[in-house]
Amino acid sequence: MYTSGTTGPSKGVRVTQAHAYGYASPAVIGRAQADDVSLVTLPLFHIGGQWAGVYNSLIAGGSSVVLPRFSATSYWDDVRHYGCTYTLMLGAMANFLFQQPPSDADRRHTMRQVLMVPVMPQLDAFRERFGIGEVATAYGLTEGSTVLVAPLGQARPNAVGLPRGDFEVRLVDEHDVEVPRGKAGELVIRTRDPWSVMDGYHEMPEATVNVWRNQWLHTGDAFRIDDDGQWVFIDRMKDAMRRRGENVSSFEVEREIMEHPAVLEVAVVGVPSAATEDDILACVVVRPGMQLDPAELLAFLDRRLPYFMVPRYVECLDALPKTPTEKIRKQALRERGVTPAAFDRPPRRVA
């Protein structure tokens, strides 16, 4: 099974039947039953579509409807036509659905459960508008199964739930030393069940050794543990930025940009700075029929973010580069860098 390839070339992950079952089991990521019909809009050559979509339903004795692609305009028509009752939905997909013009038919459908990854900030408004009864969320990876889970009814924005009992989990610094509670660190995992994580990367022995260093599987993702024990996703380690001596989460900057009414989609990346750290570039897709003034967007962010997290550059794009699984290819945006079309607000001097 190949990874999504968001940070570079896709890696072939050697998986076992136990690995696939542990990821897809309805006992882990939902309460699918024999009379359920899952809607699958993600490709079957990655774990989201195949394991969390089709396998999850088949293990429960249910059925799956596999569509060629996700479409925000026809989504609820498809749900009604096929009688779908639950689905795996990326947070970006939920946002696209939420941005569609309201309709009297928004609540006339059979969908009752959604596994949303990650949970969109407007979760309550989404559930109210579309009449979704239960929402769950989870964190998983091709290499290591479903590790963190917020069961149905317990999902909330910015958090991914609690560790599964059959995994050992730690948050560590760059030296693999466990960080204090409340501090951000890389999630590393070990399984208590044999064969429920990957056997290694296909024909990539050095990458296998690196990801398994010190006998822990390194996820490459940064988290912190909230006051209530919920695990909060911070960023991909490769997507995190360093600016003005501070660590900056692209995920947190994107979350605030998405609050602007003219923004349909955004990706934030670090670009080289003359100060040897990172400048921040926000690549924005504007909602159809609306306009966005980059200077106004930055003024909007000035009121919502610390100064060191506000982007220097803003560029409006027709679309963001994505993988077949609809994940944004940030590496492509980093390689593209700052173009002449980008709005540039030089950084303010700080005494």
What are these regions (language model features)?
Residues 3-6, 38, 44, 79, ...:
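Conserved S/T- and glycine-rich ATP-binding loop of Class I adenylate-forming
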Residues 21-37, 45-85, 96, 100:
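Conserved AMP-binding/adenylation subdomain of ANL enzymes
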Residues 140, 161, 221, 245:
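Active-site glycine-centered loops adjacent to acidic/histidine catalytic or metal-binding residues
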Residues 169, 175, 189-194, 200, ...:
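AMP-binding/adenylate-forming catalytic core of the ANL superfamily
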Residues 335-351:
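Acidic/polar alpha-helix N-cap and adjacent early helical turns
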